[in-house]
């Protein structure tokens, strides 16, 4: 059976607040092969871990991140929104998948790439987001490992693929079927999917031969993978439970 990579979505968000150091460590303790994190810039250009444009949902401050300095973010969150550099140090030796939801310019991507380089983490970091963001990453780092996020059944244009040069195609999990999975592999790309959280969905995707699953329940995925490896099958068990 092929190695299925278990990626923890924003850490271990069902147990620990997402995109925090504690959440990243919890995910690794639960068996994650890699942790997906969201990276945005503060007003003064410091990459920090935050999915949303504001602090409202997680930190109860309705303040746009781009209006705040890194020091102000630290003060408003008691230091619990880590910088990218802090996250890289805390996960030393482990893979990180950097999602860049707010990246629209090469200068933004370059700042993120620069921090990764300064931390000596190029070999364990890869990047995901939409085409605009990944074109910016490719311009900032010709050697970057990229997972191009794709959300429609219409395939990426060949000219886009030539420009981005992704290693992975990163699909919303509900789009994947056998035909699409076979086509992606035939074209020479690895398949990453996000974010199935039920056992049934995880089993279905594993049976399709995806190479990586990003989930909020990485402990469940790792348990299913261990069970399948122990049985020597590629079915990941019956598909009757949806818990």
Residue ranges and their predicted role:
Residues 1-243:
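Phosphate-group recognition and catalysis centered on beta-loop-alpha active-site segments
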């Amino acid at each position: 059976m092929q190695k299925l990579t278990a990626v923890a979505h924003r850490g271990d968000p069902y147990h620990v607040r997402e995109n925090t150091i504690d959440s990243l460590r919890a995910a690794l303790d639960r068996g994650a092969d890699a942790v997906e994190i969201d990276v945005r810039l503060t007003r003064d250009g410091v990459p920090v871990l935050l999915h949303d444009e504001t602090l409202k949902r997680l930190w109860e401050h309705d303040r746009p991140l781009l209006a705040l300095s890194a020091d102000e973010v630290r003060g408003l969150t008691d230091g619990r929104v880590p910088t990218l550099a802090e996250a890289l140090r805390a996960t030393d030796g482990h893979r990180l998948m950097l999602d860049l939801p707010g990246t629209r310019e090469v200068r933004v991507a370059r700042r993120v790439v620069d921090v990764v380089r300064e931390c000596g983490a190029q070999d364990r970091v890869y990047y995901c987001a939409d085409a605009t963001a990944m074109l910016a990453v490719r311009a900032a780092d010709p050697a970057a490992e990229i997972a191009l996020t794709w959300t429609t059944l219409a395939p990426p244009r060949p000219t886009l693929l030539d420009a981005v040069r992704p290693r992975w195609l990163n699909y919303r999990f509900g789009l994947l079927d056998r035909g699409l999975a076979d086509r992606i592999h035939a074209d020479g790309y690895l398949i990453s999917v996000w974010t199935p959280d039920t056992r049934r969905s995880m089993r279905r995707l594993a049976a399709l031969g995806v190479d990586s699953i990003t989930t909020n329940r990485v402990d469940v995925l790792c348990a299913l993978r261990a069970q399948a490896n122990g049985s020597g099958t590629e079915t990941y068990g019956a598909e009757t439970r949806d818990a």
